[in-house]
Amino acid sequence: MQGLMMDRQLLISSLIEHGAKVYHDREIVSRTVEGPIHRYTFADLHGRSKQVAGALTALGIKAADRVATLAWNGYRHIELYFGVSGMEAVCHTLNPRLHPSQLIYILNHAEDRLLFTDLTFLPLVEAIAGQLKTVEGIVVMTDADHMPESKLSNLLCYEDLLSEQDDDFVWPDFDENTAASLCYTSGTTGNPKGVLFSHRSSVLHAFCVSLPAVLALSESETFLPVVPMFHVNAWGTPYAIPMTGTKLVMPGPALDGASLTELMNAEAVTSTAGVPTVWSGLLNYWREHDTSVPTLKVTIIGGSAVPRSMVEAFDKEFGIEVRQGWGMTEMSPIGSINMLKPEQCAAPDTERYDIQVRQGRAVYGVEMKIVDAEGKTLPCDGKAFGELKVRGPWVSRAYYCEEEDEVLDSEGWFPTGDVATIDADGYMHITDRIKDLIKSGGEWISSIELENLAMSHPDVMQAAVIGIPDEKWAERPLLIVKLKAGAAPSKEDLLGFFKGKVADWSIPDDVVMVEELPIGGTGKVQKTELRKMYA
């Protein structure tokens, strides 16, 4: 016997339609590429998203066509999120931090028909345009007054296109499993792979993001996503914002400490999200200038492991709660979030920080397990470690244009490539990427554990640990650090810092001090580059 409930399709257009009806006067504030602060409402966003859909239709874009964006977090970008997907095309966000050769590969692999770009990235687009096989037009996301001169013949002005359209476009109704957006993995080992999200998966993920135990979005909150809209759809937050009526503040290209602090204070931001590298810079700015953001209550940190020193700094120095999140492009991306249980909030600082450096508990909708090398499920005792596998309604089952290649195991689990433990309370803790584990004398050494310890040294800004060949032990850990301004510790001081904190045999044999660590397009240290230099 089946239930007697209506069967309504879960479509991205329904999110902004809801936001415009229920929270019509809620604000969206953007720092623009052109400079000024821009303000408008959810109702304005809905109307202009319909104009985008009308403009795309007039340009000949059809259902399933891919439309690429190369843009910062801003109001025009979010209009494309809803306008492109709402008219049944696929919104394909591009990461401008990737190497031009990777962008060329991605655009050609996706067969994008149009490319929307912020003014910032027009020189990059001009440099690669001649190698793009399917792009018919390039739209600059600005108005006529700011349109630049360009050698490109197929250049269009965003605001001119919208001015030719009314806001009476009717959102079509279609299958919720239709493709909505496309993101490519960073491709550190080979070409990037496309992850194709559906309307259904995106809406379900938005429900998850909005939960009190995840990002706690609501009409009483003001949220600023530092995480880019070109990185896994800004962790799904643009879809959750109109669902919940949360005020949205977008930083545009200005991600330095001064700009973020000024904007957060001006708009009374209560929560934010981003990668550790951004927060490291922000913390240093606050300390150097004796400032902060008094309204900020919570920061969601993901993308790479959060150093214990960062959790402690936000808490003790500024009274801000850190919630570590974990996920991956193939998971839309959120899989777990670390929100303390009520009884843990009153625990001593040391105990709380021990918990907060873990990646957290699975969100509803995501199942997790760890397995050994033979695929046998391991116990959730906080000690056994194995490969982390996941499954759920917003987890990818295949890569774009590679549908025939097996990704899932025989029971439908996705292999993450992470090594983790899970304890009895469900807290998952990633000990390393499988490819980053160091095997020394038959024993495994976690590079993440050593990196987090190094980051707690008062002189260290960033740290990475890689395995380098060793005749006796097969591999030994090498510590590579970027120091804070003015710091000059000795090698002995840095290596001695590990004494008593980890087993002696896992302490790195040497340390290299560098001006900069190689950072990839998603804000993570590129260990493949470090291995080329030192291993």
Role assignments for model-derived ranges:
Residues I28-G74, I78-F82, H99-I104, N154-D160:
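Conserved AMP-binding/adenylate-forming core of the ANL superfamily
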Residues A362-K389, A424-D425, A487-K491, Q526:
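Conserved beta-loop-beta connector loops within the AMP-binding
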Residues L56-I61, D166-T178, L182-L224, G236, ...:
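Conserved adenylate-forming
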Residues V203-T222, V232-T270, Y285:
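Conserved AMP-binding/adenylation subdomain of ANL enzymes
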Residues L98, I104, L115-T117, T272, ...:
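AMP-binding/adenylate-forming catalytic core of the ANL superfamily
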Residues R66, W72-H92, P96-P100, N108-L114, ...:
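A short helix-loop-beta submotif of the ANL/AMP-binding
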Residues M243, A266-G274, L283-D354, E367, ...:
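Gly/Ser/Thr-rich phosphate-binding loop
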Residues L15-E17, A58-L59, G86-D160, F174, ...:
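Structural core segment of the AMP-binding/adenylate-forming
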